Amino acid sequence: MDATVTVVGNLTADPELRYTATGAAVVNMTIASTPRMYDRQSGEWKDGEPLFLRGILWREYAINAAASLAKGMRVVAVGKLKQRNYETREGDRRTSVELEIDEIGPTLRYATAKCSRATQAGHGVSPDPWADSQTGQGIDSHTTRSEEITENAKNGEGAGKNELNKKVLVGDNVSYEDFDSDEVPF
């Protein structure tokens, strides 16, 4: 049974992107998680002992993390704790615990983030996840007046909320005017 944990902390260095002999991308990083406790006697917050946890990511996920994360960033990581036994050059046996990361990203407590869809050559990932597989047309080709509707609602013009509710994603030759507000599923 794997022990799944969530760790929140700061990256101690930029993620280290390397490639195995077979060409698989791998990233190693260290997350420093320092608990903070309130000392009632002094009336101050104090740092506890930091935990330095080594994390590892593989393949496309490793490439995306290396391109997105940097030293000092506060991140939240979810993964499985793995114990690794090894022998040093001197012949000493050692054990280390690593976090095999399933999910990682910046926390938004003290920062903002903008995300963009990663495209990997040869992996069939479309730059537009909503694109029609046959025509290649994206979502913008299927919406009608969405910017105008949004602007009118902000200015109190038009039908307001009801008009905004009609901003639905529909196929070719169908527009939001074809729906009554009672038919809109939201």
Swiss-Prot record:
Question: What SUPFAM superfamilies does the annotation carry?
Answer: Nucleic acid-binding proteins
Its gene is ssb1
For bias type Acidic residues, the affected ranges are 175-186
Extract the Gene3D superfamilies matched here: Nucleic acid-binding proteins (2.40.50.140)
Q: Highest taxon of the source?
A: Bacteria
What is the native source organism of this protein?
Tropheryma whipplei (strain TW08/27) (Whipple's bacillus)
Q: Where is this region: Disordered?
A: 120-186
Q: Where is the SSB domain?
A: 1-108
| UniProt cross-references to InterPro entries, sorted A to Z | NA-bd_OB-fold, Primosome_PriB/ssb, ssDNA-bd
- Please report the name of this protein according to its UniProt entry: Single-stranded DNA-binding protein 1
